[in-house]
Amino acid sequence: MNESTMNTKNSEQAILNSEYYETQEISHEIKTVNASVQSSILKDTNTYLTEATFNLPDYLAQRREKVEAALESSITSGYPEKLYKSMRYSLMAGGKRLRPILCLASCELSGGVLEMAMPTACALEMLHTMSLMHDDLPALDNDDYRRGKLTNHKVYGENIAILAGDALLPYAFEYIVVQTKGVPADRLLRVIGQLSHAVGAAGLAGGQVADLESEKLQNIDLATLNFIHSHKTGALLEACVVSGALLVGANDEVLWRLSRYARNVGLAFQIIDDVLDVIATKEQLGKTPGKDEKAQKATYPSLLGINESRYQAQKLIEEAKKELAPFEEKAIPLISLADYIITRTH
């Protein structure tokens, strides 16, 4: 094994085994978010013009359209028909498609093109959808609505919803392997390893268990809450960002910076989710608000208050953006997506 291979393996292991959320000293001076970032995406989405204004709504709409088209063809019909219908029902229920868009953006930042990352982007949405289907079940959050529609188990029953989620999990990995073209096998293995880690006991599943065990406890502190959400929410979001760069064969420096960016963004995302659960309407959220308070769950607003929660989210976003400084204008989409996360209303 040569020195380069050893360094790559050591770096990969360090990312997977490091403490998922690092306590960071964050400056109390919060920079004003620049609403107009200089750049524009041409039809060749790998090219940017610094003299024009980057339009995030247009960027999101274009990317979402591409992701929707890819997802539409990712799962067709089959037997048992009810299983496939259940899988498609939740996968094609809409949503922001933020996770696949983050994957595509990090791939482009690292020098890749959309086509090489689209199968992984779709797989990430499959994994996210699986987690929502299971999270909505009566045994967990017991939600009736998701993305403005009845949850899967309300339409197909709990048994089918569980099995459809189970089916989406391995299919996501199969889809990466079968559909990705022009990417070396060793890179695909690293991507699959990253995604497996993100949804397993060291990631999403572990965070979910910690969340369940913390319900109705009165002594939940901020460190515990950070642990729960850096795993339950942040692990998969980190995989979205890092996997896009892995497909291109990005070096250790790029991977580490993107990992730190994603960890900060992931926690900020959850803080804003908690805030919106308090202040947003059912129509805005597409699901029932106020569920956390009714379940007596510890949340960022319950520990910090609304204003301090927003402040902490803003600080995390500023730290995330600092990690992207060396990439200059290539990082504009990821910077803008970070700002979007704390200004969204649903």
From Swiss-Prot:
Transmembrane segments: none annotated. GO terms for molecular function: metal ion binding; prenyltransferase activity. It comes from the Bacteria. GO terms for biological process: isoprenoid biosynthetic process. One of its GO terms (cellular component) is cytoplasm. Keywords: Isoprene biosynthesis, Magnesium, Metal-binding, Transferase. Pathway: Isoprenoid biosynthesis; geranyl diphosphate biosynthesis; geranyl diphosphate from dimethylallyl diphosphate and isopentenyl diphosphate: step 1/1. Its EC number is 2.5.1.1. Isopentenyl diphosphate binds at residues 96, 99, 128, 147. Mg(2+) 1 binds at residues 135, 141. This is Dimethylallyltranstransferase. It comes from Fischerella ambigua (strain UTEX 1903).
